[in-house]
Amino acid sequence: MANKCVNALRWDGRGWWCAGVDGTGVADVRHHHGRTPSDHVLGLVGGGGAARSTASAWAELGGRIHQLPSRRMFEDVPYMDAMTSDAPDVIVDFDNKDVLDAEVLLLRSVYEPMDGTVDERAAAITGGVLDGRWLLVAQHLACWRLLWAPERAQDLPSLGMLLTQLLEAESLLATYA
């Protein structure tokens, strides 16, 4: 826990287990979109626990990190050797800033209510800007795969399938509002 970031807990009847799966979730989303750590520089906006977890996971997978201006900057972190000044190919925004760069795939950590059909909702979150629903789904899958039920990892749905199910649930729930 060199990152000092935990976002998942598990009680097994005898003790507590913890994990920080933000970084694993981001790596899974990027992999789903064809962006692998070894081939892409990750731009990070943020310096809190989620950003530290993401930087650590990206570095462990052989990636390089470019921290972009944010409220908190990294200081004395174990992955300093993975830091670069090279321009990022992909960006994750944990500070909810207006990062505008049409040349890179952007993942925002936040999401807001949407209107529309399932197809319209899917189109809204699959362009050059991915909203936080991607991270929400990827983190939950990572929790199940790594912490809650690793023995059932092969039974988990794919990231795309679970995201589609989330959009279908949101669309259905909107009909009751």
For the regions a language model picked out, list residue spans one by one:
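Glycine-rich adenosine-cofactor-binding loop
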Residues: 20-23, 30, 34-63, 67, ...
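A general structural motif
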Residues: 38-41, 87-88, 101-104, 126
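Phosphate/diphosphate ligand-binding glycine-rich loop within oxidoreductases
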Residues: 1-33, 125
